[in-house]
Amino acid sequence: MKVAGGLELGAAALLSASPRALVTLSTGPTCSILPKNPLFPQNLSSQPCIKMEGDKSLTFSSYGLQWCLYELDKEEFQTFKELLKKKSSESTTCSIPQFEIENANVECLALLLHEYYGASLAWATSISIFENMNLRTLSEKARDDMKRHSPEDPEATMTDQGPSKEKVPGISQAVQQDSATAAETKEQEISQAMEQEGATAAETEEQEISQAMEQEGATAAETEEQGHGGDTWDYKSHVMTKFAEEEDVRRSFENTAADWPEMQTLAGAFDSDRWGFRPRTVVLHGKSGIGKSALARRIVLCWAQGGLYQGMFSYVFFLPVREMQRKKESSVTEFISREWPDSQAPVTEIMSRPERLLFIIDGFDDLGSVLNNDTKLCKDWAEKQPPFTLIRSLLRKVLLPESFLIVTVRDVGTEKLKSEVVSPRYLLVRGISGEQRIHLLLERGIGEHQKTQGLRAIMNNRELLDQCQVPAVGSLICVALQLQDVVGESVAPFNQTLTGLHAAFVFHQLTPRGVVRRCLNLEERVVLKRFCRMAVEGVWNRKSVFDGDDLMVQGLGESELRALFHMNILLPDSHCEEYYTFFHLSLQDFCAALYYVLEGLEIEPALCPLYVEKTKRSMELKQAGFHIHSLWMKRFLFGLVSEDVRRPLEVLLGCPVPLGVKQKLLHWVSLLGQQPNATTPGDTLDAFHCLFETQDKEFVRLALNSFQEVWLPINQNLDLIASSFCLQHCPYLRKIRVDVKGIFPRDESAEACPVVPLWMRDKTLIEEQWEDFCSMLGTHPHLRQLDLGSSILTERAMKTLCAKLRHPTCKIQTLMFRNAQITPGVQHLWRIVMANRNLRSLNLGGTHLKEEDVRMACEALKHPKCLLESLRLDCCGLTHACYLKISQILTTSPSLKSLSLAGNKVTDQGVMPLSDALRVSQCALQKLILEDCGITATGCQSLASALVSNRSLTHLCLSNNSLGNEGVNLLCRSMRLPHCSLQRLMLNQCHLDTAGCGFLALALMGNSWLTHLSLSMNPVEDNGVKLLCEVMREPSCHLQDLELVKCHLTAACCESLSCVISRSRHLKSLDLTDNALGDGGVAALCEGLKQKNSVLARLGLKACGLTSDCCEALSLALSCNRHLTSLNLVQNNFSPKGMMKLCSAFACPTSNLQIIGLWKWQYPVQIRKLLEEVQLLKPRVVIDGSWHSFDEDDRYWWKN
């Protein structure tokens, strides 16, 4: 087909994946030939992790040694290098230069050892060093690997190098020319190279297979002893012929030489790690179309040729789920026989050693939802069962548990797979490299006259680059970019979001080519809607492969099918022409989203339900659990309602698109902002990605109008881009938490895209995106709190962030880095402290600080422009010298009001300079947190002395220190003095008992300042509480909040507490969680609650051993009490009958309860309905298992 400007958009152009991997797609009913030649970079997910990188120059031996070295952590690897330097310096024959060892990473070091020592000595030296480091497990693993990777037979050693280009089907001299030509980026030369490669591959295939068979001879001879060597050879010969032909058909085997590092990586995929874990299942996961199936097939071929798993597996069987599903019932025996050359497989002999079998299950996603319908398992490999039962049984190691598995699955299917698979190792398959992606977009997607401008546009569009990892999507994007470059006939939207690019492709393919009209007629629109309906039902049912019945149900006949083939949207399956798939899953998601828009044309806009028979309403997506497999459909739906895409859609359809869909999507996002407690970080991030697809600033602003606080997990570049775009249009945002992980390269000197011209290499792509994100944070007019807890930031990232937060317009008052990894760039923070006059609170909890860091911090705090009021240095690994510096700040900083050193080894020695500072009249500190600091009674003596003279300190936390009764006695003596200003005292888990309570009771008698006391997790027992109650009944005691969690209390103390509840005019909160009060104890408390004089507003009865027997008394008390607003009843054993009584009390008009701690799921449906009715009757009531307070920040001051 041709468009204006002479642009040729034939089938070959459509699927030209990259300069190095050209493939073609025919327009007739033949195979869809997808380009699936992924690079296999270092990236693993889930348990257990192994780090991998590949290099074309690595031999199996050096790669095996590299695998062992990757087992070392950073410190161990440095130790290994030091020991190697020592050994090398002592050697008189082969010494490696010291500087080369010092500068080598894992890959280089493995190569250096092989270069200077040779394979055998390299392994022996490494094993010796492992033993010196006392790494016995790794040493044993290395010995096993040495035997496999460094055989004595020199010919075998050559075989282990991996096949040469002359010995692999489809690899020839032309491929080398093709690789060189690709670098020159000339389409004509690339085409010539591909033609030459095709001819050469055809001429040499027979010779290469023969050579591979000769190579296999030695291996076959070794297995002959097992009694079926001939059978093995026949099977391998059959596999080589079959899979070599498949690779040749796909035209994707020209990169085999470059892919050999993948094979080397997979060679060790089943090896034990340093902890002794050895998986029997390896999962290859990645994006749809990334090349997982191609890699799986290549594994089979590589094994058959003798290059992989020799000596480990006698047989490797390829089980494509899609083809297996065609039979209602089968057995493992039948599947094996079907793969055998003459269908007469020696099954008994094969199954006699299951530990030498490898099954490759390709396409776990193709099972769809069938696994949800049946949980049956099978143990007999000869028994006939539905294919999904056999697959589940293999995955769960019920069937042939000793065998090994490789499973391919899309990223979106990994969560479902995790519930089926047993102890797997996950390996991520990533697509083509950044350099290849840029080449692809420059050569295929941008006109020659736009190269310079286009390169800058590509570099700025990280989403576009990221999606081009998948060759099929990259091909589609290239065509779309070309369409957008054409002016005139094309109706493509000028929008470079993925929705815009997919729309450019699909709308162009659907547009009639006639001169008279450019829009679809009614009949064509009906066909389009039917087709899109099939797509949407496939999305919801997790179905991506369709058969004739699916087409028939939707009323799609042969003529419509031919049209879809011609448009390269729906294609015959590459493995079976009776089935049909979309060119890529993203096209199915796009068409599914388009269905909702088409449906709205036939219904009044205000009533548009976005509903089909087997799907969910658009507004029910959140409530129904919009699973990850349908995320892109939702994102495309948002993109379709944007102005840039809607206008060309209206041209195509020949009628206006109603706005009902847009209004419902707007409402869905708004709901997330209105219910922040019910919104997960993933929900918010998903909404941001959806909004990003619209590129409509006004729409985004309206959607985010209700958002005041957000939590975003930033795990990839696209998350950062979408978040940056949305947050700058979030008008009332006040608090944000961002967990940034995995987006910054470990080696900051590494260039992300070497193909980029030198004049554009001043910053990496991610640095530019991060700078934009930080600029938004620094200039947002309403943002007051930034939490980067758990983030991993490099030195450059920290420098950029801090530079933006120093901006005069930055309004941030609270900056939090709790448990963040920012040590390399922490020095940049102190300039913010001095420059940003709005910053009031800084939390560095969990950040390791050196003495120099603390010195710089103290210098910043001394600066006259510093107005910091709160500093948290929890668990920062501080030393005694640090406390000396910090104590000096307490006497010189007029602004610092709160200091936390929790989790540091302050000890009694460190408390002394801090106490000295507190005694100085210039000290303005009000809150001091010394939780878990190793303080004893000796340190209490210093603190007690400071409390006497200090007039400012009102909050003191000494929890989790071994103070004992003696230490508390010293503190209480000071607290009894009139000059002590202490108001809140935390003594949780300080080894206090009844005697300690006696000292505290004496202190309370003469202290009118203390209002909050926490004694949780101390064995004070009933007698201790009774001593406190004696004082609390007195009007002179002003205690408002008493925490007695897990204090070994029983019903014996409840009468005393009840008396306090009824008589005290000050006690507002009492927490008795995790004490064995029982029904009798609570009944006694209820007597106090029923008294009119009770002012208690908050009562904690979690895990107090309550049953339905106390519900009557509790209900009566709740009905009478008008002050109690918060009640925690979690983890108690109430029957439905008892809960019905409580629900009646909750709903009573005289009850003022607003926060009720209960696990709804713990009770039957009828009780859950009653609780929901309470919330409908009283909308302000919160019923939740996570009991909280309206004054969380104030109540838990020592935590925030």
Swiss-Prot record:
ATP binds at residues 286-293. Residues 57-148 form the Pyrin domain. The keyword Repeat applies. Residues 192-202, 209-221 have a biased composition (Low complexity). LRR repeats lie at residues 704-727, 730-753, 780-803, 809-832, 836-863, 865-892, 893-916, 950-973, 979-1002, 1007-1034, 1036-1059, 1064-1092, 1121-1142. Phosphorylated by PRKCE. SMART domains: LRR_RI, PYRIN. Keywords: ATP-binding, Cytoplasm, Cytoplasmic vesicle, Disease variant, Golgi apparatus, Leucine-rich repeat, Mitochondrion, Nucleotide-binding, Nucleus, Repeat. Changing residue 462 to C: In OZEMA19; uncertain significance. PROSITE patterns: DAPIN, NACHT. InterPro entries: DAPIN (IPR004020), DEATH-like_dom_sf (IPR011029), Leu-rich_rpt (IPR001611), LRR_dom_sf (IPR032675), NACHT_NTPase (IPR007111), NLRP_HD2 (IPR041267), NLRP_innate_immun_reg (IPR050637), NOD1/2_WH (IPR041075). Residues 142-232 are annotated as: Disordered. Expressed in cumulus cells (at protein level). Highly abundant in oocytes and early embryos, however poorly expressed in somatic tissues such as the liver and spinal cord. Residues 280-602 form the NACHT domain. It is linked to Oocyte/zygote/embryo maturation arrest 19: An autosomal recessive female infertility disorder characterized by reduced fertilization rate, oocyte maturation arrest at germinal vesicle stage, and early embryonic arrest. Component of the subcortical maternal complex (SCMC), at least composed of NLRP5, KHDC3, OOEP, and TLE6 isoform 1. Within the complex, interacts with OOEP, KHDC3L and TLE6. The SCMC may facilitate translocation of its components between the nuclear and cytoplasmic compartments. As part of the SCMC interacts with the SCMC-associated protein ZBED3. As part of the SCMC interacts with the SCMC-associated protein CFL1/Cofilin-1. Interacts with PRKCE. Interacts with TUBB3 at cytoskeleton microtubules. Belongs to the NLRP family. Component of the subcortical maternal complex (SCMC), a multiprotein complex that plays a key role in early embryonic development. The SCMC complex is a structural constituent of cytoplasmic lattices, which consist in fibrous structures found in the cytoplasm of oocytes and preimplantation embryos. They are required to store maternal proteins critical for embryonic development, such as proteins that control epigenetic reprogramming of the preimplantation embryo, and prevent their degradation or activation. This is NACHT, LRR and PYD domains-containing protein 5.
